UniProtKB/Swiss-Prot annotation:
Belongs to the universal ribosomal protein uS12 family. One of its GO terms (biological process) is translation. Keywords: Methylation, Ribonucleoprotein, Ribosomal protein, RNA-binding, rRNA-binding, tRNA-binding. GO terms for molecular function: rRNA binding; structural constituent of ribosome; tRNA binding. It comes from Wolbachia pipientis wMel. PROSITE patterns: RIBOSOMAL_S12 (PS00055). HAMAP family: Ribosomal_uS12_B. Part of the 30S ribosomal subunit. Contacts proteins S8 and S17. May interact with IF1 in the 30S initiation complex. PANTHER family: 30S RIBOSOMAL PROTEIN S12 FAMILY MEMBER. This is Small ribosomal subunit protein uS12. With S4 and S5 plays an important role in translational accuracy. Interacts with and stabilizes bases of the 16S rRNA that are involved in tRNA selection in the A site and with the mRNA backbone. Located at the interface of the 30S and 50S subunits, it traverses the body of the 30S subunit contacting proteins on the other side and probably holding the rRNA structure together. The combined cluster of proteins S8, S12 and S17 appears to hold together the shoulder and platform of the 30S subunit. The modification 3-methylthioaspartic acid is found at residue 90.
């Protein structure tokens, strides 16, 4: 227990909060990485599916697990992708999303609605 004098001299340390997306660093909204493994995994209870995810190597950080949104994808090992923050609630440890339509990952085929989220250009 500190004395009043010690508190006056040094004060109390503030709480430091843990970053939700440490791989993006302080000021990067997105980072580029290389896929090391592309696979499917099952979500937590009570959901049931085969969710598509990829292990992505980010230079200067390490490997993270990122979710591949949308129906169908063309990712394989050594594909270069752009990741953003954003967790997947029913997949433990998945704290990043891969951006569709950027670098090696194509946009979703035949997508008509919410196109900008899935990297699809306006057709017609």
């Amino acid at each position: 227990m500190p004395t009043i004098n010690q508190l006056i001299r040094k004060g109390r340390l503030g709480l430091t909060h843990k970053k939700k997306v440490p791989a993006l660093g302080e000021s990067n909204p997105q980072r580029r990485g290389v896929c090391t493994k592309v696979y499917t995994t099952t979500p937590r209870k009570p959901n049931s599916a085969l969710r598509k995810v990829a292990r992505v190597k980010i230079s200067g950080y390490g490997e993270v697990t990122a979710y591949i949104p949308g129906e169908g994808h063309n990712l394989q090992e050594h594909s270069v992708v752009l990741i953003r923050g954003g967790r997947v609630k029913d997949l433990p440890g998945v704290r990043y999303h891969i951006i569709r339509g950027a670098l090696d990952l194509r946009g979703v085929q035949n997508r008509k609605k919410a196109r900008s989220k899935y990297g699809v250009k306006k057709s017609g």
